[in-house]
Amino acid sequence: MIKNIFFIMFFLTSLTLKVNAACDDLPEDGVVYSGCAFADSQDLSSSYLPNADMTFVSFIGVIFNKSIMLNSRMDNSQFPESSWVRSNLYESSMQNSNFEDSDFTSANLHKVSFRGSSLLNVNFSKALMTEVDLTGANIQGAVFDQTLLGNAIFPDGTKCAVDSVGECKKMK
């Protein structure tokens, strides 16, 4: 009986350690941070995080400037007041997440999905947003100065013409 209790306690402890260990892993290709809550305002500039799983995370005020995060998953997460200047987020999924008051200036957002996300007051100036999906997203107050929006889908389902820059010209 005592042996069984000891085994169960050891098993549960090892599971807990494995879950927490992922949150402490260094940024790298394919890292899994799913469900982690991080300290506010971390500077992770120039991070290499392609194929990362950052679903259900909290990263308030994080700085990911000049980071490479191709094909990463950041769905259902909290990234308000974050900075992604000149980051490469090609084909990433950022659905149903909070990016309010964030800065994506000059970021590569080609084929990124922001479906259902809160993008209030986000700066997308000079970003590459071709084929971006903003279906159901809240883009109130968002800035698109000199942003390439060819074939982007806006929140109301409008598909932008290929030559859309700074504003979505409805496809003919």
Residue ranges, per PLM feature:
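Sec-dependent N-terminal signal peptides
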Residues: 5-13
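Sec/Tat signal peptide C-region and signal peptidase I cleavage site
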Residues: 15-21
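Hydrophobic alpha-helical segments, especially transmembrane helices
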Residues: 4-5, 19
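Tandem repeat scaffolds
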Residues: 21-172
